[in-house]
Amino acid sequence: MALPLSTCLLFHPKESRSRRFCFSPASASLKSGLHSATSAKIASMPTCFEQTRGRIAKLFHKDELSVSTYDTAWVAMVPSPTSLEEPCFPDCLNWLLENQCHDGSWARPHHHPLLKKDVLSSTLACILALKKWGVGEEQIKRGLHFLELNFASATDKCQITPMGFDIIFPAMLDYARGFSLNLRLDPTTFNDLMHKRDVELKRSNRNYSSETETYWAYIAEGMGELQNWESVMKYQRRNGSLFNCPSTTAAAFIALRNSDCLNYLHLALKKFGNAVSAVYPLDIYSQLCTVDNLERLGISQYFSTEIQNVLDETYRCWMQGNEEIFMDASTCALAFRTLRLNGYDVTSDPVTQILQECFSSSFRGNMTDINTTLELYRASELVLYPDERDLEKQNLRLKLLLEQELSSGLIQSCQLGRSINVEVNQAIEYPFYAIMDRVAKRKSIEHYNFDNTRILKTSYCSPNFSNEDFLFLSIEDFNRCQAAHREELGELERWVVENRLDELKFARSKSAYCYFSAAATFFAPELLDARLSWAKNGVLTTVIDDFFDVGGSVEELKNLIQLVELWDVDISTECYSHNVQIIFSALRRTICEIGDKAFKLQGRCITNHIIAIWLDLLNSMMRETEWARDNFVPTIDEYMSNAHVSFALGPIVLPALYLVGPKLSEEMVNHSEYHNLFKLMSTCGRLLNDIHGYERELKDGKLNALSLYIINHGGEVSKEAAIWEMKSWIETQRRELLRLVLEGKKSVLPKPCRELFWHMCSVVHLFYSKGDGFTSQDLIQLVNTIIHQPILLNDQTGAGLSKLHD
């Protein structure tokens, strides 16, 4: 079951301190987008790329929102404040007269065939407005003819039912009867509509709650004499509107002549001219949607200045308690998630309060918006502080709710064409901390729905919600980067051969996996050197780990450490064995190569630091070897102080920090923040490894964190209890790591460097999500999708993009 009315609505009655709920602007999308794309044609269009980029940039400077014939019709019904016999907004009437479709309806251009109920509702509202003021007889006649021909759609269960349709549309039919409009309607359909309205009203009365009151207030124009207008006006906002909805506000003014309602309608018309939109204002949500699209699709780097401006403005509005954010569940959740992920200091209290209201409500009727539920779930994942227990609890409840939706098999989205079941399944199976950045972006591209239609009481759209330009740019960028990544992988594989690492028969060959972990996390072309440093050191740590585990004698291991300590040695005479010679030669050559590249960026020699990083790893591995040889059983603390280093992430991550752009001073790399980030990241990895490798290592007679935890507790703790404790430890370490990565004000390390620690944390979470490290077939498929398989357009989407960009 999705969240109820409260997830879609946040209202603020004047005499109540508790928040209520308002309709979320994210409702329905109508076209299924891309599943796959050819890079050949796209790669040959640099001019088209820039043109597309330019069109997207314009979205930051102008919010484009469609007008609503339904809401405009209700505004047109508003009488003058000085005379009930004259329209207050005659220009709205003229707009209705000029915008009737050829078939007699007042439909949006190119409306979806499943939106016939919306078209019926909009058309009837327009007829009522014209009839009220005695204009447009010909338009009324054509509109009535359209209604009569299409009336059966009003009860068609295959059609999308706009919010409140079953109440509002029958009410408007009653209004039409009062205007003596001669509607020749099928009596069976008409009676079915009226019966359904009566049933819903009776059900709502039986289960009356604050949520019911909220819902009735939102559909005020359809309640007629049943409406308690005093109750409705509790939901009036500071801008004079009811729910930022022109139609509801117009109905309220018609009933009460409230001057603030009228002022709001003037503002809405000032924004759009002679018509209004279905929701106003929607600027913050629209801009956040643009940012979210760009970030999810992996093209935010092309709009960094524009995005920064949106984030700063959103943060300003957040701090001011702007109603546009806090009166809407989706906007609040999206703003919180976007701001927190971009390092802004925002409290989770508003999101928690929304969720507490949701779950405390007994109302499970008219409003079930799975899209808003998913948005709230994503926001609730971002627990950073120990005092955010309430947010953590709500996250677990939301996860359970989404799992129930999936298992029911009845999960539906208000956004037609959106693969909401896929999104929900992915969100549950791969939390944000357990999916690598490029993997998430490819999935977003593959399931992208570029229709931008949403549905509340009527449909509306905006290119800020989604559009083909976002899709086109993301496909081209992904495939272009992927082509470069394939070349880099080829370079890595040549490096393996040139350094004779392929001759080491004891070692696992994992060059593709090592490179994948880099390409799937920091993929920008300019980070080539950082990726290759990461991947080469990943290969070397795998080789050396195997050397310590199975490939080398104690004499060889000691010799390797001694060679690294001495460094400038004659390998032809100082190496204990052929294997040691290959490993040390590759290690020394690679460290020097990385040191030379880093020198160009840093302006100082960092080779000795890389050597020290490697020595830390080698000595920690040697310590574990000696413990095993001597049958020494360390305490869990002794084990972890060494094991977080022996997990071997140091040589992979730390040298790469010098190659991602910012300069790192010696003071920075000696700072406690640097070491804390490394320890948190490595502890997560080590504990995940030890949980998943417990049975195998137990059979091999090896100790790890899980077995030591059980031993240190006298064997009185079960394996399951120990695993639960380990996972809690991982969660604590991961959240602290994320907090340090996101909090920028007090940070010493530059953000691009801090992010590498989080990227590696995501890598290890994904690698251990299904099996023990490099064993999952799913992982093999992921490597192929990120490095080898370009995104291909299906026929329908490809034709749409070709038409758009030819």
UniProtKB/Swiss-Prot annotation:
Checking InterPro entries in the record gives:
Isoprenoid_synthase_dom_sf, Terpene_cyclase_plant_C1, Terpene_synth_N, Terpene_synth_N_sf, Terpene_synthase-like, Terpene_synthase_metal-bd, Terpenoid_cyclase/PrenylTrfase
> Does this entry carry the keyword Magnesium?
yes
Q: Which residues bind Mg(2+) 3?
A: N689, E697
Record: residues binding Mg(2+) 1: D545, D549
Compartments where found? Plastid, Chloroplast
The UniProt note on the cofactor reads as follows: Binds 3 Mg(2+) ions per subunit.
Q: What cystine pairs are annotated?
A: none
For this protein, what is the EC number? 4.2.3.19
Q: Name one Pfam family in it.
A: Terpene_synth_C
Q: Where is the transit peptide?
A: 1-48
UniProt keyword annotations, A-Z: Chloroplast, Lyase, Magnesium, Metal-binding, Plastid, Transit peptide
The record's annotation in SUPFAM superfamilies points to:
Terpenoid cyclases/Protein prenyltransferases, Terpenoid synthases
What does the record give as its pathway? Plant hormone biosynthesis; gibberellin biosynthesis
Give an example GO molecular function. Answer: ent-kaurene synthase activity
User: Catalyzes what?
Assistant: ent-copalyl diphosphate = ent-kaur-16-ene + diphosphate
Q: Does Thylakoid count among this protein's keywords?
A: no
PANTHER family in the record:
ENT-COPALYL DIPHOSPHATE SYNTHASE, CHLOROPLASTIC, ENT-KAUR-16-ENE SYNTHASE, CHLOROPLASTIC
Domain remarks in the entry? The Asp-Asp-Xaa-Xaa-Asp/Glu (DDXXD/E) motif is important for the catalytic activity, presumably through binding to Mg(2+).
What family is it from? Belongs to the terpene synthase family.
Q: What is this protein called?
A: Ent-kaur-16-ene synthase, chloroplastic
Per the record, the gene is KS
